[in-house]
């Protein structure tokens, strides 16, 4: 496979929109023992400024194993990283963000609290596709494949140690990078099902006056309607109805709503609107719940779920 490569599962071109200097991110670290009170002594345990290069990154996350062609259709090592993400998916996301970020700034400057948006068919397509790809490229949807692959390798290793099964020693496990892609973000049937459904949903753009929409290592939040607890994140696009939230920048949010379940969204369909800090806090909670390791705040304000020490 050649040299090990560090590859981002949330692209740096996206993360920079939440960076306070263009190269670093105010980061809340999950998995730490979290206190309810922030002090100068303990806040460095879970709030840090981290380089864009060191978050949402993994070794050989997209690298195809060319020595395992039977399990990856003989693809070249860098085809996912270069041909799909670098040459196609990420430029499309960058263009979409640029287009609607400019509109968001205009809305804020003009104090237009609600305005209709004349989306082109191409814009609607690539907004949905960008959300679909980013949702599926996250590690959460890869963990089960890694577990299956580990079990397979252990079984093959055990069997190969028996003289009667020596031929199994040359059998490789899954190519996890390929299988992840094939089952999720490169799965055309799954994409068609997603797009057919979401094309009938209401699309809204929200603009925060405060400019502190969080993002995370799982930035696209999809909530299954009617579910409770952790089951809200277990979405089947074939059967379930859902809502989607995708922060494009620290002040711009993309949202989709089922009009049958949320009839009030019909009058807001294809609009861009300014929201207050209360609304910002609500969708920021979604990022916190959806994240695995990192939550990012442009303003370094994590007071939503960590209270500052009282003076009293």
Tell me the role of every PLM-derived stretch:
Residues 1-6, 10-312:
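Alpha-helical structural context detector biased toward long hydrophobic helices
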């Amino acid at each position: 496979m050649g040299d090990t490569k560090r590859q981002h599962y949330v692209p740096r071109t996206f993360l920079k929109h939440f960076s306070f200097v263009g190269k670093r991110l105010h980061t809340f670290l999950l998995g730490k023992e979290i206190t309810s009170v922030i002090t100068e002594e303990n806040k460095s345990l879970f709030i840090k400024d981290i380089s864009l290069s060191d978050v949402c990154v993994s070794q050989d996350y997209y690298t195809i194993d060319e020595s395992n062609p039977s399990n990856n259709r003989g693809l070249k090592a860098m085809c996912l990283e270069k041909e799909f993400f670098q040459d196609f998916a990420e430029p499309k996301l960058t263009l979409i963000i640029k287009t609607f970020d400019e509109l968001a700034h205009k809305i804020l400057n003009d104090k237009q609290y609600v305005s209709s948006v004349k989306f082109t068919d191409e814009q609607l397509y690539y907004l949905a596709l960008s959300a679909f790809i980013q949702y599926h490229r996250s590690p959460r949807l890869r963990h089960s494949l890694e577990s299956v692959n580990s079990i397979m390798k252990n079984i093959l290793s055990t069997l190969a140690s028996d003289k009667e099964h020596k031929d199994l020693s040359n059998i490789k496990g899954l190519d996890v990078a390929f299988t992840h892609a094939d089952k999720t973000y490169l799965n055309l049937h799954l994409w068609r099902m997603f797009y057919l459904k979401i094309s009938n949903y209401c699309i809204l753009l929200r603009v925060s006056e405060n400019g502190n929409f969080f993002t995370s290592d799982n930035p696209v939040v999809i909530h299954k309607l009617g579910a409770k607890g952790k089951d809200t994140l277990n979405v089947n696009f074939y059967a379930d109805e859902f809502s989607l939230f995708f922060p494009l920048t620290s002040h711009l949010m993309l949202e989709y709503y089922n009009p049958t379940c949320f009839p009030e969204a019909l009058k807001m369909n294809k609009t861009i609107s300014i929201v207050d800090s209360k609304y910002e806090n609500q969708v920021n909670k979604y990022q916190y719940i959806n994240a695995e390791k990192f939550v990012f705040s442009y303003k370094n304000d994590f007071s939503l779920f960590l209270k500052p020490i009282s003076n009293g």
